[in-house]
Amino acid sequence: MFTSYGYSTMIKVFLLCLAISAAALIFPLWAQIPIHLTTGLALLFTLYFFRDPKRVAPDEKRIILAPADGKILLVQKQNGNIAGKTSTLVSIFMSPLNVHVNRVPLSGKVTRLHYRPGQFLMAFDNRSMESNEKMEIGINNGEIEVQFSQVSGFLARRIVCQLQKGENVKLGNRFGMIKFGSRVDLILPPSATVLLQPGQRTRAGETILARY
């Protein structure tokens, strides 16, 4: 299954690969082979990147799910992000080989949507949290609020977010993606207990990131 967020890119890559392979037919067979192999691999990688496997959210209450596939880069306490109280920052790094479809971490109402232009530093560089292009999102369920950001990276220069401010969203549902390598940063409220440590892997919509 492929994500609809990638249809336009997949079509463009397919047409480009087809054109290159067709143009290569003017060369001798020995010269055509590496060209066909290269375009074939490029097309296969594109299809692999835009895969969208089925995910089933845990049937549990008072949980916060990982919004992205990847590896935990950072778990850090910080002050003043949510109602002036101590919160926990959790950063997830997505390599180009991870599934890049993002999923809702908490059921509730979308209270914040803010696009912020910026740079395109490497996503594993913690400076990218403040400097890079990103979409800032907030979800409140009446008990807690979770803030998180889709952050562009050096390769990822296209953020897709289909959320609308004021809409109600369900835990584990798809809401967007970041194309070609990136990170997601979450700010969790004081009542949330993070269950993962740096270095551990996550699966969007399935891995329980925290409980509250």
From Swiss-Prot:
It is an enzyme of class 4 (lyase). Binds 1 pyruvoyl group covalently per subunit. GO terms for biological process: phosphatidylethanolamine biosynthetic process. The lineage of its organism: Bacteria, Pseudomonadati, Chlorobiota, Chlorobiia, Chlorobiales. It is found in: Cell membrane. It is a peripheral membrane protein. Its main location: membrane. This is Phosphatidylserine decarboxylase proenzyme. It comes from Pelodictyon phaeoclathratiforme (strain DSM 5477 / BU-1). Heterodimer of a large membrane-associated beta subunit and a small pyruvoyl-containing alpha subunit. It catalyses: a 1,2-diacyl-sn-glycero-3-phospho-L-serine + H(+) = a 1,2-diacyl-sn-glycero-3-phosphoethanolamine + CO2. Keywords: Cell membrane, Decarboxylase, Lipid biosynthesis, Lipid metabolism, Lyase, Membrane, Phospholipid biosynthesis, Phospholipid metabolism, Pyruvate, Zymogen. InterPro entries: PS_Dcarbxylase, PSD-A. Belongs to the phosphatidylserine decarboxylase family. PSD-A subfamily. The keyword Lyase applies. GO terms for cellular component: plasma membrane. The active site is at 182 (schiff-base intermediate with substrate). The record marks 181-182 as: Cleavage (non-hydrolytic). NCBIfam families: PRK05305.1-2, PRK05305.2-2, PRK05305.2-5. Catalyzes the formation of phosphatidylethanolamine (PtdEtn) from phosphatidylserine (PtdSer). It comes from the Bacteria. Pathway: Phospholipid metabolism; phosphatidylethanolamine biosynthesis; phosphatidylethanolamine from CDP-diacylglycerol: step 2/2. Is synthesized initially as an inactive proenzyme. Formation of the active enzyme involves a self-maturation process in which the active site pyruvoyl group is generated from an internal serine residue via an autocatalytic post-translational modification. Two non-identical subunits are generated from the proenzyme in this reaction, and the pyruvate is formed at the N-terminus of the alpha chain, which is derived from the carboxyl end of the proenzyme. The modification Pyruvic acid (Ser) is found at residue 182. Its EC number is 4.1.1.65. GO terms for molecular function: phosphatidylserine decarboxylase activity. Pfam families: PS_Dcarbxylase.
